[in-house]
Every structure is written in structure tokens, then in C-alpha cells.
């Protein structure tokens, strides 16, 4: 299967330099930038996450979509940074405005759930209960089979989509891949949940995800660095992505949710060798 292996470029503002001690002397070293991003809806603060600057609008869209606060880009009029260039803190507040004739209403969606600001390692914090999440998660149909070769191809694309990690060793990454093996979106971030939100948001904008997606084939694979936790599976299911591949292990909750949601969950992927924790029949396998 042919894949796009062109290396991605690092986004502006994602890398900083700091002086460090090394071998008895001092050198300037590249480190990944971590800054807060406040997400607002129609001017009202909803959440704050620690993220790496870059694709902030996609992060906000992906986050709101995964939470069920928006159903697609049709709900959104504008996504803008607040303030003016040059002002202190400019670029660290995103305001998502409702489309004309629409009203994005987080309070209605989040009613009955305790919602608090999130961090890069939030996981399932801020939710009233895991049971509530299980009840509202989207269940994917069996759909068409996916070749194990696509999983291997997705991990190759992931490895080539981490320019900031190559310079700093300090970020997570995520890529969405189509059934043809072509990348749809890629992103890096200090938080793996943020990286997934960024690629889902990019796919939303491109018309590849959402109830009215029509710009091309839907994503068939989400490849992520690090472990696959509960929230990664939730975000993939919300976006209708049938297969998740991770270089590391999933958590127990991730496995349980993947099985319930009809998502194929692969861990410890090394080429076409992998552990399949849920819904292996989509890959032509029998078992979990």
C-alpha cells in the first residue's frame, strides 16, 4: 500500500529555546512550547487546556464536536483568536461563534454533567460518571473490512508527521488516514487528547467528518503516539473513525469502551504486528 511519507513542517510558535547544562557546559536546547488555551463559545468561557500552539481553531472545533456541543461545522460561524496581535496573551483565547440562525448551547448539552476546565492530561475528569459517557457514546456499524496493511501504513505516516518531536522529543502526535492510505490530517501537541482534537477539527473543516461530510471518503484509521486512553476512543467514535492504532498500550476503560462502541482498537503496533483488543473482525481476525 502506497503512503505519503513527506515529512511535515513544524508550526510557528511550537518550539522555544532554553539554556541547559550539558557535559559540563551550557547549550541552547529546543523544547516544545506549552501554553494555556481558553476555549469560549459565543464569548463565554467553557474550558481551558494546556496545549502546544498551532491549529488552535481545529483543536477548539474537535473538542466541541467530541463533547457533542456542536454537531458539525454547520453550527459554527467563526472561530477566532481574541485580542489583537502584539497584546500580552494574544493567541491563547479562541472564541467559537454560532452560525447565523444557530445557537451553540453548551449548558443544554452538558446538563447533568459536572464540567470543569481541562488539562492536557485530563482524561475523563470533569464528567459526572463513566456510565453517563457509555450511555451517550456513538456505536459504529461493522462497515467495510479494513486491511491490516492500512494500520501499518498509518503508523508509518504517524512517524513522518512529528517534526516538533524530532527537534524536542516532547510531543504526542495523531493522524487520520483514509481507506486508501492517504493522510487526511496530522497534528502534534503536548497533550495526546489535544492532538486528536486537532486532527478531528481539521477533518471537520475539510468536510471529511460530521453529519454532512461529503468532501471525500471518511477517515478509516486514527493513529496515535503514546497510550490509547478512554477519551481517545470516545473522540474516535464521535468522529465515526472505525480503527485506532497506538504505538503503546490501551487502558482497561479504553478497551471496554471500544468493544461497546464497535471501534477496532490496536496497540503495540509494529508494522503488521499488533495486539488487537477490540473488534478484530473488522481486520479479518477472530477474538475480542
Swiss-Prot record:
A GO cellular-component term linked to this record: cytoplasm
UniProt protein name: Sulfur carrier protein FdhD
Residues the record marks as active site: 122 (cysteine persulfide intermediate)
Localization per Swiss-Prot or TrEMBL: Cytoplasm
Any Gene Ontology biological process: Mo-molybdopterin cofactor biosynthetic process
Major localisation: cytoplasm
UniProt keyword annotation of Cytoplasm present: yes
SUPFAM superfamilies named among the record's database cross-references: Cytidine deaminase-like
Domain of life: Bacteria
A GO molecular function held by the record: sulfur carrier activity
Any matching Pfam family: FdhD-NarQ
Described purpose of this protein according to its UniProt entry: Required for formate dehydrogenase (FDH) activity. Acts as a sulfur carrier protein that transfers sulfur from IscS to the molybdenum cofactor prior to its insertion into FDH.
Keywords: Cytoplasm, Molybdenum cofactor biosynthesis
Family, similarity comment: Belongs to the FdhD family.
Binding locations of Mo-bis(molybdopterin guanine dinucleotide): 268-273
Amino acid at each position: 500500500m502506497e503512503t505519503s511519507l513527506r515529512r511535515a513542517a513544524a508550526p510557528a510558535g511550537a518550539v522555544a529555546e532554553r539554556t541547559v547544562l550539558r557535559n559540563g557546559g551550557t547549550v541552547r536546547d529546543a523544547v516544545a512550547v506549552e501554553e494555556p488555551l481558553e476555549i469560549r463559545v459565543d464569548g463565554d468561557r467553557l474550558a481551558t487546556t494546556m496545549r502546544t500552539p498551532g491549529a488552535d481553531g481545529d483543536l477548539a472545533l474537535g473538542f466541541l464536536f467530541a463533547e457533542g456541543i456542536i454537531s458539525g461545522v454547520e453550527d459554527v460561524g467563526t472561530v477566532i483568536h481574541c485580542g489583537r496581535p502584539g497584546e500580552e496573551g494574544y493567541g491563547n483565547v479562541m472564541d467559537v461563534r454560532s452560525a447565523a440562525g444557530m445557537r451553540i448551547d453548551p449548558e443544554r448539552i452538558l446538563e447533568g454533567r459536572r464540567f470543569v476546565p481541562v488539562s492536557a492530561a485530563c482524561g475523563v475528569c470533569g464528567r459526572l460518571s463513566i456510565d453517563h459517557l457509555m450511555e451517550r457514546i456513538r456505536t459504529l456499524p461493522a462497515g467495510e473490512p479494513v486491511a491490516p496493511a492500512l494500520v501499518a501504513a498509518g503508523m508509518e505516516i504517524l512517524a513522518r508527521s512529528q517534526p516538533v518531536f524530532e527537534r524536542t522529543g516532547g510531543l504526542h502526535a495523531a493522524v487520520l488516514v483514509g481507506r486508501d492510505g492517504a493522510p487526511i490530517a496530522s497534528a502534534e501537541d503536548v497533550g495526546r487528547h489535544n492532538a486528536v482534537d486537532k486532527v478531528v477539527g481539521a477533518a471537520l473543516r475539510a468536510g471529511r467528518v460530521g453529519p454532512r461530510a461529503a468532501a471525500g471518503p471518511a477517515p478509516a484509521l486514527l493513529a496515535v503516539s503514546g497510550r490509547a486512553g478512554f477519551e481517545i476512543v470516545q473522540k474516535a467514535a464521535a468522529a465515526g473513525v472505525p480503527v485506532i492504532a497506538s504505538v503503546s498500550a490501551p487502558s482497561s476503560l479504553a478497551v471496554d469502551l471500544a468493544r461497546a462502541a464497535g471501534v477496532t482498537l490496536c496497540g503495540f503496533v509494529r508494522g503488521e504486528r499488533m495486539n488487537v483488543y477490540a473488534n478484530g473482525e473488522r481486520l479479518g481476525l477472530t477474538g475480542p
